[in-house]
Amino acid sequence: MSRQGRFGGLMAGLLMLGTLAGCTTAATGGAYLLPQTTQAAAQRSVAADAPLLEVMPVQLASYLEGGSLVYQTDDITLVQASQNLWADDLQDMLTRQLLTQLKASPAQPLSQYRIADTSLSGLKGARLSVSLDRFIGRHDGQSVITGRWRLRGVDGSVLEEGDIQTLTPLTDDGYPALVNSLGEGWRVTGEQLAREIAKALPATADAS
């Protein structure tokens, strides 16, 4: 139980979020954006006729769609914060950051693909779908991201699929630390997805 001891202070701090969520004074509230990934500047250009990977909007469990930060206070209880909210649509933020990371990945043959969201009507390519059932803080001082991903080929067949499970320790108490931890967890998740997708995508003529 050394891990439990390590996060003892953080557990208390995360449980304090429940008190913050119940406060009615604006001073306790906040609106938060996910931290930007540091890879945005590393995105590379690819050939206009390169094969396409479409990234579907990240799907969220219904309780994550309300705009509130969510944390788990014990084994069975989830609490939605009433005063501490996402400043932008969570689905949009997660999808944008996933796109950024996939575009920046050096993994072959992924780096030879055009990567875009599904707004490019009329184009058809491989398709990545991601669904999350947990994007929360937890009473043991960690943020938790869990879900599933699936990669389909141009013909709709499943090329690969798998689970998502990323645990990231909080470095401090409070909502800002929770947001930073979730942001780091999503960055790590994006890197893991890029590696797994690269293994499953068909090679391109330019891939070495």
Show where each model-derived region lies.
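A structural "domain/chain start" motif
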Residues: 23-92, 200-208
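Soluble periplasmic/extracytoplasmic beta-strand elements of cell-envelope proteins
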Residues: 52-58, 70, 127-131, 144-150, ...
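Short secondary-structure boundary motifs at beta->alpha junctions and helix caps
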Residues: 77-85, 155-195
